[in-house]
């Protein structure tokens, strides 16, 4: 291979490698999950080490705790061992929460997909949470004699984590900012509650984004964030979408 050819590739790595991971819960318990790993290296012209072999050696250390200092220490070690310019790691996995129905208080498991990512040269870990919520259209409510169209929506909340943040607290921040929450177990009294709760709290997707942004901006442990909300419209062919990034706000 010529020297010119050796400089064409900018990044190399592995993707979709499944590994066991342990997540801490707010109640002090540990939750075992399976994470899909992606790790990429921004390469120089030549490599000193074997990327796949080094990944397999170091990955078990990443699964023990998701904590900024330990992750960045391991990433720097990885970077030096294989002689690359930059390393980026992401782990994606489901996180389960036992959630009570609002009236019957019956419990069911809610699944929240999350991704943790970090790079050498950066100080924090970025946590991305995918949270289902309910939106109810304010316009539909205003023009109708009875009822209003409502639907499930997905909020994607990305937070730069320089100090530890409980996933449950981030999920709660998002869920409390929508027309109503989503539950896995609902009896008839619960369905009545969530229907009326959404009707009394109509929101466009941009309203949800704004409310999350204000609450995130006031949180002492959140330094940077972005939020997107996509509503899977029940009566329209299209979906509704809104997005905001804290870098563009004066909060």
Swiss-Prot record:
Site note May be catalytically important, residues: 137
Superkingdom of the source species: Bacteria
Pathway this chain belongs to: Cofactor biosynthesis; 7,8-dihydroneopterin triphosphate biosynthesis; 7,8-dihydroneopterin triphosphate from GTP: step 1/1
Listed InterPro entries: GTP_cyclohydrolase_FolE2, GTP_cyclohydrolase_FolE2/MptA
Keywords: Hydrolase
Swiss-Prot/TrEMBL catalytic activity: GTP + H2O = 7,8-dihydroneopterin 3'-triphosphate + formate + H(+)
E.C. designation(s): 3.5.4.16
Any single GO BP term: tetrahydrofolate biosynthetic process
Annotated coiled-coil segments of the chain: none
EC supergroup of this enzyme: hydrolase
Keyword Hydrolase recorded: yes
MF (Gene Ontology): GTP cyclohydrolase I activity
Signal peptide from the UniProt entry: none
Biological role stated in the UniProt entry: Converts GTP to 7,8-dihydroneopterin triphosphate.
Family according to the record: Belongs to the GTP cyclohydrolase IV family.
Protein name: GTP cyclohydrolase FolE2
Lineage, uppermost ranks: Bacteria, Pseudomonadati, Thermodesulfobacteriota, Desulfobulbia, Desulfobulbales
């Amino acid at each position: 291979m010529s020297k010119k050819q050796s400089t064409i590739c900018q990044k190399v790595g592995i993707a979709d490698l499944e590994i066991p991971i342990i997540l801490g819960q707010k109640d002090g318990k540990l939750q075992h999950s399976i994470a899909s790993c992606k790790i990429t290296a921004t390469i120089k012209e030549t490599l000193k080490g074997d990327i796949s072999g080094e990944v397999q050696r170091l990955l078990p250390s990443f699964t023990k705790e998701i904590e900024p200092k330990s992750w960045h220490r391991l990433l720097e070690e990885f970077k030096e061992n294989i002689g690359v310019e930059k390393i980026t790691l992401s782990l994606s996995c489901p996180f389960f929460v036992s959630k009570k129905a609002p009236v019957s208080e019956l419990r069911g498991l809610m699944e929240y997909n999350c991704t943790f990512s970090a790079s050498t040269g950066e100080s924090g870990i970025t946590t991305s949470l995918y949270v289902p919520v309910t939106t109810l259209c304010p316009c539909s409510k205003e023009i109708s004699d009875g009822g209003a169209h409502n639907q499930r929506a997905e909020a994607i909340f990305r937070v730069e984590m320089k100090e530890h943040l409980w996933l449950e607290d981030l999920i709660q921040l998002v869920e409390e900012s929508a027309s109503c929450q989503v539950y896995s177990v609902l009896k008839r009294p619960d369905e009545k509650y969530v229907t009326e709760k959404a009707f009394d709290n109509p929101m466009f997707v941009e309203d949800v984004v704004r409310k999350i942004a204000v609450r995130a901006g006031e949180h002492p442990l959140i330094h940077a964030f972005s939020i997107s909300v996509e509503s899977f419209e029940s009566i329209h062919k299209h979906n509704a979408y809104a997005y905001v990034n804290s870098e563009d706000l004066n909060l």
